[in-house]
Amino acid sequence: MMTESEFIRASEALFEHIEDQIDENGWDFDCRFAGNVLTIEAGDGAQIIVNRHTPNQELWIAAKSGGYHFAEQNGKWLATRDGRDFYDVLNEALSAASGEAVEIAEL
């Protein structure tokens, strides 16, 4: 398990990476980071929320498709419920919100 400061650094790097990937690829999303929350808004107003839950050292995604909790396991963020990869869930949510294929590369 990471220390709290390691978790915060890792999650901040992940949030920055997501924003950079969206900007570099020109996808139609607006990103806002405030506190522990990265809000990604599609052109039609659909939102995907990515936040960190420091006490549990989890990343959470909230989207129209549902809510997901991810814990770090062997260098990957995997869903606590079904083991799905963070990037797979995020890319599906972003693709559904934008109507185009979105592929955020792993950090």
Curated annotation (Swiss-Prot):
Recorded hits in InterPro entries, A to Z, give: CyaY, Frataxin/CyaY, Frataxin/CyaY_sf, Frataxin_CS
Source domain of life: Bacteria
Question: Entry's CDD domains?
Answer: Frataxin (cd00503)
- Keyword Electron transport tagged: no
* Keywords associated with the record: Iron, Metal-binding
GO terms of biological process kind:
iron-sulfur cluster assembly
GO cellular component terms, A-Z: cytoplasm
| Alphabetized Gene3D superfamilies for the sequence | Frataxin/CyaY
Family matches, as Pfam families = Frataxin_Cyay (PF01491)
Q: So what does this one do?
A: Involved in iron-sulfur (Fe-S) cluster assembly. May act as a regulator of Fe-S biogenesis.
- Family membership, please give it: Belongs to the frataxin family.
Name of the protein described by the UniProt record = Iron-sulfur cluster assembly protein CyaY
